[in-house]
Amino acid sequence: ANAVLPFLNNLWTTTLTGAQFKEALEQQWQTDADGNVPSRPYLQLGLSHNVSYTYDPNAAQGNHITSVTVNGKPLDLKREYRIGSFSFLLQGGDNFRAFAAGKDTKDTGLVDRDAWIDYISKNSPLKPRYDRRAVAVTGIPAGGKVTAGTSFDLQFSKLTLTSLGVPAETK
């Protein structure tokens, strides 16, 4: 457990608007507070199984995320969402400054490693999910607007997982 969660962060919750959550997803393409690209230019967030998004890896900074769904519905930029994560991230760690803008932030008192061990002991054997939550899509028309009678080509990538033990795609 310590090899996977070595930092002993507490689990916190906070409330973000949809716009703030989308901004946090944008911050996976890293810049520091001064706008400089750090030594790790991309850090992908782990997300709950009910959240997915598409992105354009070639887009300008701040414009990578092209769609987000929560529970199969489009993210409402004005709605508030309650999220949970590690205290380090919700304080803006690893350049995820959008998380620090959350409100009504609460410390659950649970340590990440201990909660993970407890979850595994209560839910074993675990069944991993192999679905993608982030898919790269390029070729989306500027502004996301499509005019009737016109055509365009979309390219999709990052459709399959490449981790050790993931079953081969059959479709």
List each model region and its residues.
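Feature captures C-terminal
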Residues: 1-171
